[in-house]
Swiss-Prot record:
The keyword Metal-binding does not apply. This is Inner capsid protein VP2. Keywords: Capsid protein, Inner capsid protein, Repeat, RNA-binding, T=2 icosahedral capsid protein, Ubl conjugation, Virion. The N-terminus binds RNA. It is necessary for encapsidation of VP1 and VP3. The N-termini of 10 VP2 molecules form a cylindrical hub underneath each 5-fold axis of the inner capsid. Residues 19-30 have a biased composition (Basic and acidic residues). Residues 1-35 are annotated as: Disordered. The record marks 219, 223, 227, 838, 840 as: Interaction with the intermediate capsid protein VP6. GO terms for cellular component: T=2 icosahedral viral capsid; viral inner capsid; viral nucleocapsid.
Amino acid sequence: MAYRKRGARREANLNNNDRMQEKNDEKQDSNKIQLSDKVLSKKEEVVTDSHEEVKITDEVKKSTKEESKQLLEVLKTKEEHQKEIQYEILQKTIPTFEPKETILRKLEDIKPELAKKQTKLFRIFEPKQLPIYRANGERELRNRWYWKLKKDTLPDGDYDVREYFLNLYDQVLTEMPDYLLLKDMAVENKNSRDAGKVVDSETASICDAIFQDEETEGAVRRFIAEMRQRVQADRNVVNYPSILHPIDYAFNEYFLQHQLVEPLNNDIIFNYIPERIRNDVNYILNMDRNLPSTARYIRPNLLQDRLNLHDNFESLWDTITTSNYILARSVVPDLKELVSTEAQIQKMSQDLQLEALTIQSETQFLTGINSQAANDCFKTLIAAMLSQRTMSLDFVTTNYMSLISGMWLLTVVPNDMFIRESLVACQLAIVNTIIYPAFGMQRMHYRNGDPQTPFQIAEQQIQNFQVANWLHFVNNNQFRQAVIDGVLNQVLNDNIRNGHVINQLMEALMQLSRQQFPTMPVDYKRSIQRGILLLSNRLGQLVDLTRLLAYNYETLMACITMNMQHVQTLTTEKLQLTSVTSLCMLIGNATVIPSPQTLFHYYNVNVNFHSNYNERINDAVAIITAANRLNLYQKKMKAIVEDFLKRLYIFDVSRVPDDQMYRLRDRLRLLPVEIRRLDIFNLILMNMDQIERASDKIAQGVIIAYRDMHLERDEMYGYVNIARNLEGFQQINLEELMRSGDYAQITNMLLNNQPVALVGALPFITDSSVISLIAKLDATVFAQIVKLRKVDTLKPILYKINSDSNDFYLVANYDWVPTSTTKVYKQVPQQFDFRNSMHMLTSNLTFTVYSDLLAFVSADTVEPINAVAFDNMRIMNEL
């Protein structure tokens, strides 16, 4: 049906064209005379190139009507051409993924994370004073110190507690310092005899509180007075006293032992510069030799892409290549000293006016030629190859000059860089417009979906050696993959790098221009020959342009740190063939090469993004592994993956398809956990009980009995229904009970007068009013489980009677022994012991961390005119 409709539309267009033709028959003769007068006129017309556009002078403005008619013809021809191409080639519909402008920023806008420098020690615990109660519930005057959580936010429920530990792990990963300098966080010990220092302000405040506590032993006070730093200047080492919970000490000691900083010297800076830049004779590099012995740096994490984002992650790959493309365009140098557009157009006009009457199609040869388009084309080609962005070609078949320029483009840029449909359309236009008519061959009727391209078909049918040889080169023009300094690079063919392939192209073009075009009118043959002549007149400049393109591409490619994987992108970079014509016709003889500052900037941005990318992968892998080991079966892995992508900054996470998210999750699961992150997780895993028992928010379970149990004395609370151990009780895990929903076992045990312990994280609720407690105690616990069967609403109440309680007089006056059918199981927090909490921490006395290693390198270039390519010959030889 599609073909039938298109055919009908073409017939309608042809009928309209016939009617217009009849109306314009009378005017054609006069138009031809006016056009011939204009072409043969010797009167000079001045063309300027202000604002990068060709402006038309007063002389030309007089014939605006004539030009508008010509423009109508051009537009009509272009429209017919587009319909023809659509008729011959069914356009393949591909999914589009347009990143939002607000999300997609240049990679250079993403600032590298500064080395995380900790200004205080990592702490989970802090010591707190709690009162002591006598056997009768009265409060004593003395206190006791216990380790409690600094930030007590533990939720109730075993699953939620495990999720809390995952969040704690994530927090530790975020805060984990790259290096520690204890000197920067040390503060004065107010109680020191000789103005000594302790490791941080919290240690100092703990020392103050203990020193002022009346119950502190004299020996401890004397020890605090002696607490000070110990410096070993010859070894650049300093020891500071600290007061830390054993778990906090384990964390901080691990951070100190596994710092990421490494000594920095000139060799490291020298090797940090990409080898090809170091060995490039066009760049003169000097290094500052005055590095102090305390200089340090953090080695960037440049592991190659472990996720293979190019494989089945179309949306992600499109975004990352687009970001790379935007960055690459900003570092490609601007072309200088281009041929004056005015002078070049005048020269081209003279070449086109060698014979009497210029035919219609030749008037298009000059359209769109300007220096801005030339510069834009140069940047687009290099940036697309650097970022491996797929390009699509935009052209008009009747503009033979564009097609001839396209032949140069297809010669120097590998086929893979163009989207298949666009490549086929361009090749088909070149074959049917230039190559086949030259040899009198019939038009090629290309079938959509043919595995061979038009050039591959033409190569088998063309007998002329030079043309077939050129077609063979284009058909086999692919990137050569080479691993350089551990990075996969896409390298151009040597014949392109040295420009020799242009001679091959010119031989083919000259052969085509010598052919008779037997099936075409003479004017057609003349137009093609003139177009070829225009390009062949610039043979030397085209060789230089090709060498310049290859040199800039390879020099900038040396600064890329991630593997250059070649995969077709969802969206493409559009390239007008008229801009390729501008580049070919306007390229001058001025060499442009990237400045050293530009190269260093490009290299630093690539290193920063690559290193951040790997660190975020390590974080995501660690969190996923931790979630699995903590048995967080309800955890949404997609949320972890989304968080990972957000931390890379360049992705519009909400628009990434779900299938790619889950594929990313699966690949992250396969990666091993980085050793530092694994050790930190094991530290948390081993000490979960210690952290949990230091919380005042939750209890560890509840004991339920059918008959009342007496309240017992507890040093921390007075008379309470608290159990400190579960010996002698049958235990049932609350989480498993809630998941199974089978309460028969509990009911039977209680009816048989056997107390049962439900073990799990429960809210630790205190209610000091005895009167209110008596009324609701049994209902809140026993009734809910046995009757309502809702364990998730279980909130055991801590029944506490002491001298701080309003109801203490009940016990004192009436000798009443309170009882309860429940007991809250609460583990005892760790008691604070000064001797066990005093630790000496050791670090370097001083060092300086340098983030930008290339700041030590001063660089310059040779005079651009003397710049040489890989073959030790000048990049631009045509002077």
